[in-house]
């Protein structure tokens, strides 16, 4: 992707789509599918046609079907090395704990979800790349947009994105990351297509205002996630995720899913135009 196009993309996303260590998943399969399907429904015809073409070249059926693909690479003997090489691109840790993105410390050598998005959006938008390269980039972009909107994939604590924070949920032992990945979403007792319909029926999501002085939309999305994690009450003091916690934070999780879907659609519309 040319430098001028990268700058234009950054400006576009900032104006129209404001912006844990270890091998962990974000949202789980249900959340990633919801984000992908919400985005699919908001694609322009030209972008949708290009997505379909790339998916067909990849042998895939739908955007939702490939949304969790990066999480399964390390379990695939043929893709294990790619999974290992991209493992750090699923998340980031705010080192100073203040949720202020400082690239040299928060994304050293571009090995964080912000760097992952920058890398694969550039490949996706490069028409000189092969269909295989661009299809692979598409799958990473879909997944990483979902990842960066899961609050615990851009946290400010040294607890492996909540994996080390043990909680009781529904009478069973768990951890806070798993609760946010999927456990809270499952309390709706809806399959992902019906869940997507429910969220889509809420209408257009209100986009947060840009956070100055950032000119990197992906970093802004990470800062938003971090601010949720840093708020009082996000980590339950008694290590118990009760009905009151779910009532408070399930709408927050659903808003993040809706934002991710909208932003992914706008990103693909712009990149594939």
Describe the predicted segments one by one:
Residues 10-20:
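Bacterial N-terminal signal peptides
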Residues 2-3, 18-26:
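Low-complexity, Gly/Pro
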Residues 2-12:
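Bacterial N-terminal signal peptides that target proteins for export
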Residues 25-144, 151-273:
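N-terminal, motif-rich segments that launch catalysis or mediate targeting to/interaction with membranes
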């Amino acid at each position: 992707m040319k430098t001028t196009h990268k700058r234009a993309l950054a400006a576009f996303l900032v104006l129209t789509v404001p912006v844990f260590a270890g091998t962990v998943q974000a949202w789980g399969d249900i959340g990633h599918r919801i984000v992908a399907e919400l985005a699919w429904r908001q694609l322009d015809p030209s972008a949708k046609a290009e997505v379909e073409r790339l998916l067909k070249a990849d042998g895939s059926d739908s955007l939702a079907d490939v949304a969790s693909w990066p999480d399964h690479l390390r379990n695939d003997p043929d893709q294990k090395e790619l999974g290992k090489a991209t493992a750090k691109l699923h998340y980031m840790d705010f080192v100073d704990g203040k949720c202020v993105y400082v690239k040299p410390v928060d994304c050293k050598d571009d090995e964080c979800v912000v760097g992952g998005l920058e890398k694969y959006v550039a490949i996706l938008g490069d028409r000189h790349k092969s269909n295989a390269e661009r299809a692979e980039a598409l799958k990473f972009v879909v997944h990483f947009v979902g990842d960066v909107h899961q609050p615990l994939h851009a946290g400010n604590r040294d607890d492996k994105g909540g994996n080390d924070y043990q909680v009781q949920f529904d009478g069973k032992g768990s951890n806070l990351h798993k609760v946010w990945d999927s456990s809270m979403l499952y309390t709706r007792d809806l399959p992902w297509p019906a869940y997507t319909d429910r969220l889509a029926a809420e209408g257009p999501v209100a986009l947060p205002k840009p956070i100055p002085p950032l000119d990197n939309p992906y970093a802004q999305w990470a800062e938003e996630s971090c601010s949720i994690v840093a708020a009082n009450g996000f980590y339950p003091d008694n290590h118990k995720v009760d009905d009151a916690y779910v009532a408070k934070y399930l709408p927050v999780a659903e808003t993040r899913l809706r934002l991710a879907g909208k932003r992914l659609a706008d990103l693909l519309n712009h990149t594939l135009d």
